[in-house]
Amino acid sequence: MKIVGITGGIGSGKTTVCRYLKELGVNIIDADEIGHRVLQNKGIRTRITDVFGNEVMNPDGSINRKILGELVFGYPERLEHLNKITHPLIEQAIASLLEEYRQKGIKAVAIEAPLLVEAGWLKLVNEVWLITAPKESIFKRLRNRMGLSREQVMARIQSQATDNERLKYASIVINNNCRFEDLKSCVQLLAKERLELA
């Protein structure tokens, strides 16, 4: 089974690349989505409130990701503490899905993980595709998609590895500074060549 890690900074276009891969029959594992599910785990919620206080809780007992994000982004020590709580369970869930796909004879899997390098998940993949985009495009996407201010976007960008750091591990670099049609064609070609998909 071919396993590719799709990584890059926030707003770089990882999800778009994964959407195109899914259209080609690649199974997608979204690490952020798994992370959101991990936050629903009662034991994890308790550990998070022990560290960050009850202010991160919604009235229904779930974690308020917006408030939690404000508390950790821009504060490396806090973010590291949160990651130590959540990353082991996320990795465990990814590994479990990969094993399930292996058992089913799945040919190709892509793991969408912005923190693939930082979380130490490189061991889960055969190769890394790095998605990059100009900063101004990222600011625009995140303002439109998430309603984040420039300062909030910068805090998130600075909490992640730089593209230069990720580049050390990348087999493929996709510069998402093009039209959707061109990006889709690029992904189709890479899927054919690297994942042996027709």
UniProtKB/Swiss-Prot annotation:
Native source species: Dehalococcoides mccartyi (strain ATCC BAA-2266 / KCTC 15142 / 195) (Dehalococcoides ethenogenes (strain 195))
Name assigned to this protein: Dephospho-CoA kinase
GO BP terms in the entry: coenzyme A biosynthetic process
Pfam families referenced in this protein's UniProt entry, alphabetically: CoaE
EC main group: transferase
Keyword rRNA processing: no
HAMAP family: Dephospho_CoA_kinase
EC number in record: 2.7.1.24
